[in-house]
Amino acid sequence: MVKIFDADLIKGHIIVTDNGKRTLIDTGCPVDINENNMQRIPGLRQHLEGARGFVDPTLDGFWGLEYFARHKVLFDYRKKAVMVADQGDDIMVVHPIAEYPLLRSIVNPRLIIPMKIAGVERKMVFDSGACIANYITESIATTGTEAGSVFDEHPDPDIGRYEVKLFNLPVEIGGETVEIPFGVQPADIDRDVQMSGAVGVIGVGLYKNFQVLVDCPNRRLVLGRY
């Protein structure tokens, strides 16, 4: 079965209504956040409350990697739409230009893809929740061209709201080079990313510029032109 959801974009976050539940789509979240999981997994309710505080007070839950493991999910940010297919059904971006294997994370459950950034192939976490800024290790980011700054926010109250200085870096996608801005994450988050075997996180830099198909059943991520 294939379903198409209208998406609300709130502070860049992608939110759909699924069976009457307001659901934030976050590939950076290792599990789904719903009533069942909140009763058995410590910390999930606090994570949801944090997201209600800085994204949308009407949120009921998250689609995390549990959901993606069972489905193929296509993001069309410009049309404010999300298409979802069961494992046995096919969906595809309209004009595919690049396909990446989804690599295994060393420690934490993550969607990791190899991308050529600043002339070097690097492992990056695809995180649909990275909707304000993309991030990369400071030693790489600062080789780019300064591109202003933005404010981002994290549901952990110990991190909260913080300023992010941005640097444009060249990223090769489908035989073309695209300038994408990257910032530097707070040290604790950057350390967690590196423990996964990656050097950074990319989200908004992809789905604002391309349709994105996350096909976990077939271990691939496909980009398509708008």
Where are these predicted regions, by residue range?
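Pepsin/retropepsin-fold aspartyl endopeptidases
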Residues: M1-Y226
